[in-house]
Amino acid sequence: MAIKVELLGGLDLLFNKQKALSLSLSNLGSTKLGSLIDYMAQIIEKPSQKDLFILNGTVRPGIIVLVNDQDWELLEKEEYNLEEGDEVVFVSTLHGG
């Protein structure tokens, strides 16, 4: 079962400049959205930048998470069960100025 992940707002820089990924749910070990977040944190190109994506075991404040264009806060956050064909978008609102 495959899902699509998009990385916007500069998050692609943490993932070797990949703006979109196609992932198999079987690689995550669980269908929970929290498992996807853990997996994404593990594949960050530079481990020293992990805290730019994850903080205290979840997505850092300032990163919007959408599942099929719905805010994850409406979908049980980390407990949401991903399904075949889901599209998960991570959008960073964090930036310098």
From Swiss-Prot:
Subcellular location: Cytoplasm
Coiled-coil region: none
SUPFAM superfamilies associated with the record: MoaD/ThiS
Entry GO terms, CC: cytosol; nucleus
InterPro entries: Beta-grasp_dom_sf, Mopterin_synth/thiamin_S_b, Urm1
Modification after translation, per record: C-terminal thiocarboxylation occurs in 2 steps, it is first acyl-adenylated (-COAMP) via the hesA/moeB/thiF part of UBA4, then thiocarboxylated (-COSH) via the rhodanese domain of UBA4.
One Pfam family this sequence matches: Urm1
Alphabetic keyword roster: Cytoplasm, Isopeptide bond, tRNA processing, Ubl conjugation pathway
Signal peptide: none
Pathway: tRNA modification; 5-methoxycarbonylmethyl-2-thiouridine-tRNA biosynthesis
Acetylation is among the record's keywords: no
One function term, GO molecular function aspect: protein tag activity
Chief place of localization: cytoplasm
GO biological process terms on file: protein urmylation; tRNA wobble position uridine thiolation
Domain of life: Eukaryota
Residues where 1-thioglycine is found: G97
Keyword tRNA processing among UniProt keywords: yes
Residues joined by cross-link Glycyl lysine isopeptide (Gly-Lys) (interchain with K-? in acceptor proteins): G97
Alphabetized HAMAP family for the sequence: Urm1 (MF_03048)
Free-text function comment from the UniProt entry: Acts as a sulfur carrier required for 2-thiolation of mcm(5)S(2)U at tRNA wobble positions of cytosolic tRNA(Lys), tRNA(Glu) and tRNA(Gln). Serves as sulfur donor in tRNA 2-thiolation reaction by being thiocarboxylated (-COSH) at its C-terminus by the MOCS3 homolog UBA4. The sulfur is then transferred to tRNA to form 2-thiolation of mcm(5)S(2)U. Prior mcm(5) tRNA modification by the elongator complex is required for 2-thiolation. Also acts as a ubiquitin-like protein (UBL) that is covalently conjugated via an isopeptide bond to lysine residues of target proteins such as AHP1.
Record family assignment: Belongs to the URM1 family.
Record-given protein name: Ubiquitin-related modifier 1
Source organism of this protein record: Schizosaccharomyces pombe (strain 972 / ATCC 24843)
